[in-house]
């Protein structure tokens, strides 16, 4: 690991127990030297949605930074950044927000802004000069070297150079659609559909890895059909040939078939997959 090798940072990995994390698992690894917990709000290889409020409360009590990747949850279920005491939340837009690659969002807690330095400087993340950038570039006396300052907002963490404007427009439209449908409506639909998916998979003999706990899952359902990985790969190819696109995902031997139940999917889609 680069951070471990070059920055001399000790990294402790929290392993799942019965395909889940709890706040106690993280607490058992933390001590007075722990500075930051970095984790996914919803795991990509087993579908587990952690109790982020409990973990956030623990981090706030111990003075530990909490940084989360919400790429598998944003656009699926509600996330309360303040209630969970997130210092940073990041998420790509290309998954459950159905946006182009190279798009995403960053949330930074206001109380954390002064503690996190930006990595680079560019005209899009520095303080806008008087009159705006257009007037600045048109000024013959504009210096080539300037003592730039940064705004005390999350904008100072922008890349600084040319932005992905077309991708941002698409991301904005996608977020607008999510808000139009309502995240509560999406959440209820996906919870019901993912439960139906698990029922149908169990009916054909699959082993379900994802937990059924209410509130502890999103749209990801992980299942295994056979003990032979090559046979499962053959099944995957047959589904793809029928234009039914699921995936196989593993990490540390945890995983299986990954079925993503989106807000635009329905029971007929699940029935076609399980047929």
Residue ranges with predicted function:
Residues 9, 61-65, 86, 110:
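A short helix->loop->beta-strand "cap" motif at the edges of active sites that frequently abuts
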Residues 11, 66-67, 208, 246:
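Hydrophobic beta-strand scaffold residues
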Residues 18-71, 75, 96:
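Active-site phosphate-binding strand-loop segment of PLP-dependent enzymes
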Residues 28, 227-237, 241-275:
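PLP-dependent enzyme catalytic core of the Aspartate aminotransferase-like
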Residues 84-139:
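Active-site PLP attachment segment
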Residues 146-199:
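Structural signature of PLP-dependent enzymes
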Residues 183, 191-198, 202-242:
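Conserved PLP-binding catalytic core of the aspartate aminotransferase-like
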């Amino acid at each position: 690991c680069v951070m471990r090798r070059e920055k001399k940072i000790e990294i402790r990995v929290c392993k799942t127990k019965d395909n889940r994390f709890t706040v106690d698992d993280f607490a058992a690894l933390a001590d007075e030297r722990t500075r930051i917990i970095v984790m996914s709000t919803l795991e990509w290889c087993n579908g587990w949605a952690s109790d982020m409020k409990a973990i956030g409360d623990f981090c706030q009590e111990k003075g530990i930074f909490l940084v989360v990747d919400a790429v598998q949850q944003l656009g699926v279920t509600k996330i309360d950044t303040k209630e969970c005491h997130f210092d940073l939340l990041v998420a790509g837009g290309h998954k459950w927000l159905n946006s182009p690659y190279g798009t995403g969002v960053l949330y930074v807690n206001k109380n954390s802004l002064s503690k996190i330095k930006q990595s680079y400087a560019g005209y899009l993340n520095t303080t806008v000069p008087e009159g705006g950038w257009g007037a600045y570039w048109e000024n013959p006396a504009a210096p080539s070297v300037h003592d730039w300052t940064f705004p005390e907002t999350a904008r100072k963490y922008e890349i600084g150079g040319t932005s992905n404007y077309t991708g941002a427009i698409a991301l904005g439209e996608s977020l607008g659609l999510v808000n139009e449908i309502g995240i509560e409506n999406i959440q209820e639909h996906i919870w019901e559909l993912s439960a139906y998916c698990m029922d149908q998979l169990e009916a054909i003999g699959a082993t379900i890895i994802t937990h059924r706990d209410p509130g502890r899952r999103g749209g990801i359902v992980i299942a295994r059909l056979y003990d032979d990985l090559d046979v499962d790969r053959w099944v995957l190819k047959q589904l793809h040939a029928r234009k039914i696109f699921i995936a196989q995902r593993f990490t540390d031997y945890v995983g299986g078939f990954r079925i993503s139940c989106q807000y635009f999917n329905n029971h007929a889609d699940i029935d076609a997959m399980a047929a």
